Amino acid sequence: MRAPLLLESRDYLLSEQMPVAVTNRYPQETFVEHTHQFCEIVIVWRGNGLHVLNDHPYRITCGDVFYIQAADHHSYESVHDLVLDNIIYCPERLHLNAQWHKLLPPLGPEQNQGYWRLTTQGMAQARPIIQQLAQESRKTDSWSIQLTEVLLLQLAIVLKRHRYRAEHAHLLPDGEQLDLIMSALQQSLGAYFDMADFCHKNQLVERSLKQLFRQQTGMSISHYLRQIRLCHAKCLLRGSEHRISDIAARCGFEDSNYFSAVFTREAGMTPRDYRQRFIRSPVLPAKNEP
């Protein structure tokens, strides 16, 4: 298998002293699998797409945040008006006496340690910091180099304060509409999602919520739910031995034939063929020479 493309620090950072850079993806196009000589913070502002991080697929949209380590490999596929910022940084160039290890995950061995959601309030606070960071990182004087690190620290603290796991959105004070619906959808991967009941419990207007969701993500709520269910199915197909019919049920599809049809249409191959791509052939012992 061909090694992923390597992105080098010198192509993104203006000097060997500059610790941070910002690359605006307005929009983010399809990008082949790659790895880096640097770390990244990815913040999604609008649209949607498929982000495959270390072979784990995520259907990403407004408010998603990823902490990418240099050795990670990832790609972007099936993008639709996807707008995001990449905040690039080299840990070895950070000199402030800050608790970076508590601010910039991964904090542990969990597979999803690098994936978080960012509240609407957090997005509003982060955006001007990133804009200033982008301006300062284009300069090479010593004051700008120091200021970029200060701004990165400020951004890291804002993200630490306002990031959350999708399954824990109910613990947030004054949960925003988008945060609440995203959390509810993430918890409905294998169960029926009752939109009317959700709106009634949270005192939301269904029509307004649907309009807000489409405006921020570029797709309907039902389409997004189907997409994250398919992403979950891909994870199970490549990482478990469950039968395809069981995987369909675990991903909210009561009819396995319908699941196969939807999966084939979206992935361009059947669930069985998709699974076969990740099954390694056994290595046969070499025959002794006569």
UniProtKB/Swiss-Prot annotation:
Pfam families: AraC_binding, HTH_18. Coiled coil: none annotated. CDD domains: cupin_RhaR_RhaS-like_N. It comes from the Bacteria. PROSITE patterns: HTH_ARAC_FAMILY_1 (PS00041), HTH_ARAC_FAMILY_2 (PS01124). It is found in: Cytoplasm. Its main location: cytoplasm. Residues 196-217, 244-267 bind DNA. Gene3D superfamilies: Homeodomain-like, Jelly Rolls. InterPro entries: AraC-bd (IPR003313), Homeodomain-like_sf (IPR009057), HTH_AraC (IPR018060), HTH_AraC-typ_CS (IPR018062), RhaR_RhaS-like_N (IPR047220), RmlC-like_jellyroll (IPR014710), RmlC_Cupin_sf (IPR011051), Tscrpt_act_RhaR (IPR023699). One of its GO terms (cellular component) is cytoplasm. Residues 179-277 form the HTH araC/xylS-type domain. The record marks D246 as: Interaction with sigma-70. Keywords: Activator, Cytoplasm, DNA-binding, Repeat, Rhamnose metabolism, Transcription, Transcription regulation. GO terms for molecular function: DNA-binding transcription factor activity; sequence-specific DNA binding. GO terms for biological process: positive regulation of DNA-templated transcription; rhamnose metabolic process. Activates expression of the rhaSR operon in response to L-rhamnose. Binds DNA as a dimer. PANTHER family: ARAC-FAMILY TRANSCRIPTIONAL REGULATOR, HTH-TYPE TRANSCRIPTIONAL ACTIVATOR RHAR. This is HTH-type transcriptional activator RhaR. The gene is rhaR.
